[in-house]
């Protein structure tokens, strides 16, 4: 099964949307294997968003992510990365489809509520950056037989 990293950003935490995010991933049939509330250090934020280091918004993005705790999660399931991207919606909430997290709750690209890994390599590196192996639970949900052939 594939794993992906998902983070509810400060705006999602402040707006009380963590439960809605978790509910959508659980309803899709994904298994939660890692979950924690994190007060993000500047170093961690800069590592996570390192790909944007040369972009003009990098500084404000780092300040935003360290401003309030975030909820970091690892979800597991068949096609988890691509499915998570669909559940999350387009980066710009104004372009996100209704029924997606950003489409239903987002109003501004700078406050787009949630981050999700964009591919297998990114997922692996983000999971390793945010979680130690001992923080990830290996378990089998009772619903597995009802989800997969």
Curated annotation (Swiss-Prot):
It is an enzyme of class 2 (transferase). GO terms for biological process: CTP biosynthetic process; GTP biosynthetic process; UTP biosynthetic process. Transmembrane segments: none annotated. Coiled coil: none annotated. It comes from the Bacteria. Pathway: Purine metabolism. It catalyses: dZDP + ATP = dZTP + ADP; a 2'-deoxyribonucleoside 5'-diphosphate + ATP = a 2'-deoxyribonucleoside 5'-triphosphate + ADP; a ribonucleoside 5'-diphosphate + ATP = a ribonucleoside 5'-triphosphate + ADP. Its main location: cytoplasm. Belongs to the NDK family. Major role in the synthesis of nucleoside triphosphates other than ATP. The ATP gamma phosphate is transferred to the NDP beta phosphate via a ping-pong mechanism, using a phosphorylated active-site intermediate. (Microbial infection) Catalyzes the phosphorylation of dZDP to dZTP, when the bacterium is infected by a phage that produces the substrate for the synthesis of dZTP (2- amino-2'-deoxyadenosine 5'-triphosphate), which is then used by the phage as a DNA polymerase substrate. Homotetramer. This is Nucleoside diphosphate kinase.
């Amino acid at each position: 099964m594939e794993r992906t990293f998902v983070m509810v950003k400060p705006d999602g935490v402040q707006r009380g949307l963590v439960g809605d995010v978790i509910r959508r991933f659980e309803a899709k049939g994904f298994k939660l294997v890692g979950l924690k509330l994190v007060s993000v250090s500047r170093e961690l934020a800069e590592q996570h968003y390192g790909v944007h280091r040369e972009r003009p918004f990098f500084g404000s993005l780092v300040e935003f992510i360290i401003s309030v705790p975030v909820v970091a999660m690892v979800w597991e399931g068949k096609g988890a990365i691509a499915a998570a991207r669909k559940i999350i919606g387009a980066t710009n909430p104004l372009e996100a489809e209704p029924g997606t997290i950003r489409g239903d709750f987002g109003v501004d690209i700078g406050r787009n509520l949630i981050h999700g890994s964009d591919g297998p390599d990114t997922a692996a590196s983000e999971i390793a950056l945010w979680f130690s192996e001992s923080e990830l639970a290996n378990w089998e949900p009772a619903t597995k037989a009802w989800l997969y052939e």
